[in-house]
Structures are given as structure tokens and as C-alpha cells.
């Protein structure tokens, strides 16, 4: 019985030590790091910097990237990068304006999710096009002290209600 009691106390003691040694997460610092990734995402598009854009995404093979065009579905950053390289080749100017940015973080500081509304202005072959209110949502994950996008979805709202409710 003494052995069980000592074993119990030992387990309790080591459990307490391991729990109390956990470092406290500075959520404001994590928030700033996530915002930096999102800022780089925007900056990469404006500068047509494919390397910077790819650095915003996770290297994991099971990420999800959904664009506004019907065929824009990628499950890895390499194939998205190939398509984006072609797109950058056709754009003379890319300008983004972000508003209504919302960012949430898990209390453990390892997962973040966001929403932002983005206005896109592009020039191609002397022709300007503007796409207002592109809704962009996504999830970032912190792995090896680096935040990266693991899921992103962009959509264009339609005018009016498709179905009245």
C-alpha cells in the first residue's frame, strides 16, 4: 500500500511540475506574426512576388486553396504557385485594398482563422478591371515556430439575393 501511495504522489508531483512548466502563450505576439503573414500575402500579390506568396503557405501536402474561378482549387502550394505564376505574367499592375479584417486565435496560440474583404484592381494589356468585396477567409497553423496558411477560400458575392428569404 505504501508503494502505491508513493507511486501516486510521484505521479501527482511530476504532473504538477510538467503542467506548471508550460510556457504561457503571448497571444498578442502571435497575432502580430499572423498579421505579418496576411500582410505578406497582400504584398506578394501587389509585387507579383511568387516566392513571397509561397512563403505564406504551409509546406504540408494537405492544404486547401480555393480561388474565385471555377477551376481554382489546389491542395498544395506548388500547383497553386504554377497557376499564380501564369497569372502574374498577364498582369501589368495588381493593387489590393483590404478592409474589415477579422482575426481570431486559439488560446494555445497554434491555430488562427481570419476574414478580410479585399478589393482587387488589375491592369492587363492596357485594360483595367476591378473586383470589389472579394471575401477571403482562411486558417493558419503554427508549425516549427512559423505561421502558414493551411486553408484559404475566396469568393465573390452576387448582387441581390439569389433566393428571397
Q: What is each of the regions a protein language model found here?
A:
Residues 98-104, 118-120, 135-141:
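Hydrophobic/aromatic beta-strand elements that line small-molecule binding cavities or substrate pockets
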Residues 90, 120-130:
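Short, cysteine-centered beta-strand-loop-beta hairpins and adjacent loop/turn segments enriched
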Residues 57, 118-120, 153-154:
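Short beta-strand segments enriched in hydrophobic/aromatic residues
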Residues 19-56, 165:
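Short, low-complexity N-terminal intrinsically disordered segments enriched in polar/charged residues
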Amino acid at each position: 500500500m505504501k508503494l502505491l501511495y508513493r507511486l501516486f504522489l510521484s505521479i501527482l508531483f511530476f504532473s504538477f511540475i510538467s503542467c506548471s512548466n508550460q510556457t504561457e502563450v503571448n497571444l498578442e505576439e502571435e497575432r502580430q506574426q499572423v498579421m505579418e503573414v496576411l500582410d505578406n500575402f497582400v504584398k506578394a500579390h501587389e509585387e507579383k512576388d511568387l516566392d513571397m506568396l509561397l512563403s505564406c503557405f504551409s509546406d504540408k501536402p494537405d492544404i486547401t486553396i480555393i480561388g474565385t474561378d471555377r477551376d481554382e482549387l489546389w491542395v498544395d502550394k506548388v500547383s497553386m504557385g504554377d497557376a499564380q505564376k501564369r497569372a502574374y505574367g498577364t498582369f501589368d499592375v495588381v493593387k489590393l485594398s483590404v478592409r474589415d479584417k477579422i482575426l481570431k486565435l486559439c488560446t494555445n496560440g497554434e491555430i488562427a482563422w481570419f476574414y478580410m474583404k479585399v478589393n482587387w484592381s488589375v491592369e492587363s494589356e492596357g485594360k483595367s478591371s476591378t473586383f470589389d468585396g472579394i471575401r477571403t477567409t482562411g486558417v493558419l497553423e503554427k508549425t516549427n515556430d512559423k505561421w502558414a496558411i493551411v486553408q484559404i477560400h475566396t469568393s465573390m458575392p452576387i448582387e441581390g439575393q439569389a433566393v428571397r428569404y
